[in-house]
Amino acid sequence: MVALSNALSRVFGSLAGYKFPSFIQKGINALYVKIFKIDLSEFEPLENYRSLNALFTRSLKKERPFDKSPNICIAPCDALITECAFLDNDSALQIKGMPYKAHELVGEINPLSPSFFYANFYLSPKDYHHYHAPCDLEILEARYFAGKLLPVNKPSLHKNNNLFVGNERVTLVAKDIQGNRLYFVAVGALNVGKMRFNFDKNIQTNAKARFTQTYSYNPPIKVKKGDNLGNFEMGSTIVLFIQNTAFKDLKEKNVKFGESIGEFHAN
């Protein structure tokens, strides 16, 4: 199953990256935009994308404004927040009634503290696929975990136990502005060709790997709130674990990158 789902994603990624003649590509792009009801008002017109992958990974034409206050946490992506809560004895929900152990997802040996708040951001095929820093960060490590590439939509989340933990993923281990540990997890999914990270081009995903790989940064990589961390090559999921933060009640709400989603408490 792992080999099949990963192979399908590699094939899809290759096809999505193929550049058809311009008049054919424009028609393909138009069909995709129509099927998924994509709003291109913040992006280049569809005829500017020479492949489906270029459309998937489209960049914003203009920077989005966001609150620059250091105590404000912003949404890292355009997404539906499917679950959000404080950890309960190291347990988080991939969806209602489907728990998993947070430390297994992020790659820690010991359970995570109940001071961690988590939020699942589901990026659908229509969404902007880049992900950004939710606050000022120092990235200490990037942990790559090989795994399946099962769909991460709601039917699949209800069907498959430990889906996030079993799927291919990359965990960014970081410190926030208060020195607290923060985990930013990019979860792979079916038809996601690759996950890319702008601060380290050596991180390879969906590359037939069958092992865990850790990329350590000494000194840490400093990124500012709103910086573009990377992108999926189709929709997937970001899971954010963050401490000492008062989050808004955003379960089942759509958010846009740059929206305020919480406020840091003083330690």
Swiss-Prot record:
InterPro entries: PS_Dcarbxylase, PSD-B, PSD_type1_pro. Its main location: membrane. It catalyses: a 1,2-diacyl-sn-glycero-3-phospho-L-serine + H(+) = a 1,2-diacyl-sn-glycero-3-phosphoethanolamine + CO2. The active site is at residues 78, 132, 236. Its cofactor is pyruvate. It is a peripheral membrane protein. It comes from Helicobacter pylori (strain ATCC 700392 / 26695). Keywords: Cell membrane, Decarboxylase, Lipid biosynthesis, Lipid metabolism, Lyase, Membrane, Phospholipid biosynthesis, Phospholipid metabolism, Pyruvate, Zymogen. GO terms for molecular function: phosphatidylserine decarboxylase activity. Pfam families: PS_Dcarbxylase. The record marks 235-236 as: Cleavage (non-hydrolytic). Heterodimer of a large membrane-associated beta subunit and a small pyruvoyl-containing alpha subunit. One of its GO terms (biological process) is phosphatidylethanolamine biosynthetic process. The keyword Membrane applies. This is Phosphatidylserine decarboxylase proenzyme. The gene is psd. Is synthesized initially as an inactive proenzyme. Formation of the active enzyme involves a self-maturation process in which the active site pyruvoyl group is generated from an internal serine residue via an autocatalytic post-translational modification. Two non-identical subunits are generated from the proenzyme in this reaction, and the pyruvate is formed at the N-terminus of the alpha chain, which is derived from the carboxyl end of the proenzyme. GO terms for cellular component: plasma membrane. It is found in: Cell membrane. Binds 1 pyruvoyl group covalently per subunit. The modification Pyruvic acid (Ser) is found at residue 236. The keyword Lipid biosynthesis applies. Pathway: Phospholipid metabolism; phosphatidylethanolamine biosynthesis; phosphatidylethanolamine from CDP-diacylglycerol: step 2/2. Belongs to the phosphatidylserine decarboxylase family. PSD-B subfamily. Prokaryotic type I sub-subfamily. Its EC number is 4.1.1.65. It comes from the Bacteria. Catalyzes the formation of phosphatidylethanolamine (PtdEtn) from phosphatidylserine (PtdSer).
